[in-house]
């Protein structure tokens, strides 16, 4: 076999391969000899069919079976000789086999970039020392109260206020005729100021006293996501039927009992505080990681295989589709598409691929391995997050070896990041003043469903 390697880039190569005609002839002889043992042709005894007859009848099938075999053997030989660190699979256009001639073809491959040793020691890092406060705990409890609030009809005669809910009927009309894209809706409960209906609804309803009928004009933009309404002026005939107030439950042990997970208010507060602390720990780790890769990627330049970027993109798109699917929504329903997301997030995907390459280099460079204790701790953490047993997690990985190897590699990447932080120059700093609190109420409420 003759092999010439064309270097398209540091990560792209084309293997120009030629299998001598003598080797092709031997493989054809073997193929026809095997075929001769089983082939049946009218007028000839099995095993006695002449080669010419076999070629006339079966050459297309023989060539179709033999070419992939020859290509695979040649590719395997090239890999054995040159030890390419492949990324993804090879790309090859199946060549056409002609008896008496050599078989020539090209195989395109992508390989991991070869990096010099990564100097990661002494990176200057700022570690923000976040601290969960009682005020944040109280804010989370207020959020829980809102999720458990009830609505009651306002019996006194008064105008609609900002924090009210309203019970309305409405129907859209265009040029005096009912609009199919804005059909009649009855007994709809809307929060004043919400975006579930056009903003004009809240503006017009605010200050109104039920029962009251009114017209609300809404001018839809030409590029509105609802094509049936885009560019139209719709007059909604609205009936304000009643005002409803949100009634928040008191902060006491009864509130906690209704959550169904905690024994008393103190236990709930402790759980919220614990979630806040965990959230801050994750935030700190994320910020340190961002600083690490900003530093390393500025100092180390290398090409990234398209295959890796495409794989990261597919992961991003799959996550987006899954997130929308949880609400029975497709990408197309919100004006998105896979092609749009591929364009929008390609830079993010390339950045993620670069991180994996750098961490992979550091893992090899430092001979990092997972200890049994680290692996067991990882299983326990995953089991806790899945609300499952450790044995269930282990059994899952036993059934899928590829998932286990992927999991181990992600744990090794985390270990590499911890090593970089340990050997970095870390300065502790106070957090900047923020108006928003960390999200942990959702975590607490998730437990109530378990």
UniProtKB/Swiss-Prot annotation:
InterPro entries: PPIase_dom_sf (IPR046357), Trig_fac (IPR005215), Trigger_fac_C (IPR008880), Trigger_fac_C_sf (IPR037041), Trigger_fac_ribosome-bd_bac (IPR008881), Trigger_fac_ribosome-bd_sf (IPR036611), Trigger_fact/SurA_dom_sf (IPR027304). Residues 163-249 form the PPIase FKBP-type domain. The keyword tRNA processing does not apply. One of its GO terms (biological process) is protein transport. Keywords: Cell cycle, Cell division, Chaperone, Cytoplasm, Isomerase, Rotamase. Residues 431-443 have a biased composition (Acidic residues). SUPFAM superfamilies: FKBP-like, Triger factor/SurA peptide-binding domain-like, Trigger factor ribosome-binding domain. One of its GO terms (cellular component) is cytoplasm. It catalyses: [protein]-peptidylproline (omega=180) = [protein]-peptidylproline (omega=0). It is an enzyme of class 5 (isomerase). It comes from the Bacteria. It is found in: Cytoplasm. Residues 431-450 are annotated as: Disordered. GO terms for molecular function: peptidyl-prolyl cis-trans isomerase activity; protein folding chaperone; ribosome binding. Its EC number is 5.2.1.8. Involved in protein export. Acts as a chaperone by maintaining the newly synthesized protein in an open conformation. Functions as a peptidyl-prolyl cis-trans isomerase. Belongs to the FKBP-type PPIase family. Tig subfamily. HAMAP family: Trigger_factor_Tig. Consists of 3 domains; the N-terminus binds the ribosome, the middle domain has PPIase activity, while the C-terminus has intrinsic chaperone activity on its own. This is Trigger factor. It comes from Desulforapulum autotrophicum (strain ATCC 43914 / DSM 3382 / VKM B-1955 / HRM2). The gene is tig.
């Amino acid at each position: 076999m003759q092999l010439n390697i064309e270097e398209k880039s540091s990560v792209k190569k084309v293997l120009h391969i030629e299998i001598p005609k003598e080797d092709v002839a031997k493989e054809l002889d073997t193929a026809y000899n095997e075929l001769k043992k089983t082939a049946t042709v009218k007028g000839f005894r099995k095993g006695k069919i002449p080669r010419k007859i076999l070629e006339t009848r079966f050459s297309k099938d023989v060539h179709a079976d033999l070419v992939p075999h020859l290509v695979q053997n040649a590719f395997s030989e090239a890999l054995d000789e040159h030890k390419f660190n492949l990324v993804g699979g090879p790309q090859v256009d199946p060549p056409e086999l002609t008896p008496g001639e050599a078989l020539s073809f090209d195989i395109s491959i992508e390989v991991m970039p070869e990096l010099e040793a990564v100097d990661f020691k002494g990176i200057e890092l700022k570690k923000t020392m976040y601290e969960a406060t009682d005020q944040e705990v109280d804010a989370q409890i207020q959020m829980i109260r809102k999720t458990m609030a009830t609505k009651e009809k306002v019996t006194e005669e008064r105008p609609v206020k900002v924090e009210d809910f309203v019970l309305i009927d409405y129907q859209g009309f265009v040029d005096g005729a009912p609009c199919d894209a804005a059909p009649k809706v009855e007994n709809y409960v809307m929060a004043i100021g919400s975006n579930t209906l056009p903003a004009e609804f809240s503006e017009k309803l605010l200050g109104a006293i039920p029962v009251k009928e009114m017209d609300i004009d809404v001018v839809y933009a030409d590029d509105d996501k609802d094509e049936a309404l885009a560019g139209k002026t719709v007059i909604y005939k609205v009936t304000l039927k009643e005002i409803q107030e949100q009634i928040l439950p008191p902060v006491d042990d009864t509130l906690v009992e209704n959550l169904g997970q905690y024994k008393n208010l103190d236990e709930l507060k402790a759980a919220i505080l614990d979630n806040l602390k965990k959230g801050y720990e994750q935030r700190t780790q994320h910020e340190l990681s961002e600083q690490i890769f900003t530093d390393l990627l500025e100092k180390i330049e290398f090409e990234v295989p398209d295959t890796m970027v495409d794989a990261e993109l597919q992961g991003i798109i799959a996550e987006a589709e899954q997130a929308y699917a949880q609400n029975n929504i497709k990408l197309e329903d919100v004006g998105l598409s896979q092609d749009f997301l591929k364009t929008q997030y390609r830079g993010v995907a390339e950045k993620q691929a670069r991180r994996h390459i750098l961490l992979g280099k550091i893992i090899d460079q430092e001979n990092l391995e997972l200890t049994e204790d680290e692996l067991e701790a990882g299983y326990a953490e995953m089991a806790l997050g899945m609300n499952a047993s450790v044995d269930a997690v282990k059994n899952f990985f036993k059934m899928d070896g590829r998932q286990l190897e992927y999991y181990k590699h992600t744990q090794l990447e985390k270990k590499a990041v911890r090593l970089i932080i340990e050997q970095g120059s870390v300065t502790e700093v106070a957090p900047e003043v923020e108006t928003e609190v960390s999200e942990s109420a959702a975590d607490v409420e998730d437990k109530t469903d378990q």
